Amino acid sequence: MRKLLNTLYVTTPEAYLSKDGLNVVISVQQEEVFRIPVINIEGIVTFGYMGASPGVMKLCSDNGISLTFLSPQGRFISRVQGATKGNVLLRKKQYQLSDDASWSLHVVRLMIGGKIQNYRNILRRYIRDYGENEDINRAVQVLERAKRDALKAQDKTELIGYEGMASNAYFEVLPILILNQKTDFPFHGRNRRPPKDAVNAMLSFAYTLIANDVAAALETVGLDPFVGFLHTLRPGRTSLALDMMEELRAYLGDRFILSLINKRQISVKDFLFQGDNGVVKTDKGKKTFITAWQARKREVIIHPYLNEKVEIGLLPYVQAMLMARYIRQDIDDYPVFLIK
């Protein structure tokens, strides 16, 4: 099993990345503030517009380290990656299957079905821990019906309809799962670009990080993150990463954010409310989020398909590996990640 190394998150917008030998150096206003050997990291995510030197880009490329640039608010800008990994036969098969409507529909049914079941399992866990709730029970029934229908969808348009129905039911009752700081963290449904409340700001931020991790994992196992089966092909869009993150959103993103709020690890003071420009995290809030995110990635679970201990941060890699095996026909079906 691949070892989970650290992802270096550079949250200071004024930071500039350069190299010194085999070290990544971070400077602010031309003063060095941090350095780390490349052998200790597997990825760099930087939030800001100062950029990085060509030397550090080459250093990352040569050592298989993904270098991702996000805006200070967490919106994806670009990614630097090295030579294509994996063998050409795997990618050729991936491209063929992407054009196979029947095969693509089958695999995206599984992904969306898994996403809906993970929504359901989060709600069922609340009932198990805190007792019956009429609104949550109704939402669970909608999710169970949506999953059954999704697994029988005749085309992708129909499938997306069931996914939308499930998401609406789930997010409608999500505020019930916020047990502490309810008045500080109101939630009235999913919104973005820009997010209008702190919960949506955290959801969008987490989903960006997940998509980045999945794209890097796909590249690692030799798949093309830009050619998917559900999300349409578009220049610059990592369609397969967006496909595969669907099953991971609830566990990696939603549960993490609920935990942050309920354990009071983050507060309303960690956000800036900018009216029509939406809500963003303060520098302190961003660091609080990232620190907790990194700690969460180091936690260990039993993978439901492999029945092996896996660090949570390796879940994107494990699912990418399983997708590669399925495309090569080494396994009979793609095992989506399902939480308990």
Provide a role label for each language-model segment:
Residues 1-19, 29, 35, 87-226, ...:
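Active-site helix-to-loop segments that bind/position phosphate- or nucleotide-bearing substrates
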Residues 14, 33-34, 49, 55-57:
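Catalytic micro-motifs at enzyme active sites that drive phosphoryl/nucleotidyl and oxygen chemistry
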Residues 24-25:
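Hydrophobic residues embedded in beta-strands of well-ordered beta-sheets
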Residues 38-52:
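Extracellular/luminal Protease-associated
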Residues 42, 54, 58, 208:
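Short alpha-helical basic/polar micro-motif
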Residues 45-49, 70, 206:
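Short His-Asn-centered micro-motif
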Residues 52-54, 58-63, 67-109, 120:
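Phosphate- and other anionic-substrate recognition elements at nucleic-acid/protein interfaces
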